[in-house]
Amino acid sequence: MSTIRLIVGLGNPGPEYAATRHNAGAWFTDQAARREHATPRLESKFFGLYARSGELHFVWPQTYMNASGKSVAAVARFYKILPEEILVVHDELDLPPGSARFKKGGGHGGHNGLRDIHSALGTPDYWRLRLGIGHPGDKSQVAHFVLKPPRSEEQTLIDIAIGHALDTLPDVLRGDFPAAMKTLHTAAK
């Protein structure tokens, strides 16, 4: 059972994107870093914001979503972090707002941030926390949808799911994903 040593909060940089659905991963990671008393700072060698609490590292890529792998791979190489010790937190179109699910490995499901991380790490075998943002219903609307803020009621549901996911952090950091999954997948129904 590997422990998690790196939490990655996916999103796009800049204030114009901070409140958009695509930044749900960054919202979770902001709160997780605060809980661990880790303060982010810009770190150019990691192409993003970086924070550390003991052996736990956090990164928020500032490369835009499509190039997130550059940041993740830089931290992983520098600190010799294995893919199975990485938790990537991201928005998930295939889950409704209020849902959150852990998953290890698998495809990128069209998510460009995950696609780039797969490529940069050379494997899809890292942990993910998928935060449901819902789907616009029409595939042609996805790009527009993820770059807009959620409606108020959706934001409330996403915030609740993030809270439930944060409650699993002690299990996650120990690498006890069966316990974390049981807690989260039960709470987020």
UniProtKB/Swiss-Prot annotation:
The record marks N12 as: Discriminates between blocked and unblocked aminoacyl-tRNA. Its EC number is 3.1.1.29. The active site is at H22 (proton acceptor). It is found in: Cytoplasm. It comes from the Bacteria. One of its GO terms (molecular function) is peptidyl-tRNA hydrolase activity. It is an enzyme of class 3 (hydrolase). TRNA binds at Y17, Y64, N66, N112. GO terms for cellular component: cytoplasm. Keywords: Cytoplasm, Hydrolase, RNA-binding, tRNA-binding. GO terms for biological process: protein quality control for misfolded or incompletely synthesized proteins; rescue of stalled ribosome. It catalyses: an N-acyl-L-alpha-aminoacyl-tRNA + H2O = an N-acyl-L-amino acid + a tRNA + H(+). It holds the Pfam family Pept_tRNA_hydro. Its main location: cytoplasm. PANTHER family: PEPTIDYL-TRNA HYDROLASE. HAMAP family: Pept_tRNA_hydro_bact (MF_00083). Monomer. Belongs to the PTH family. This is Peptidyl-tRNA hydrolase. The gene is pth.
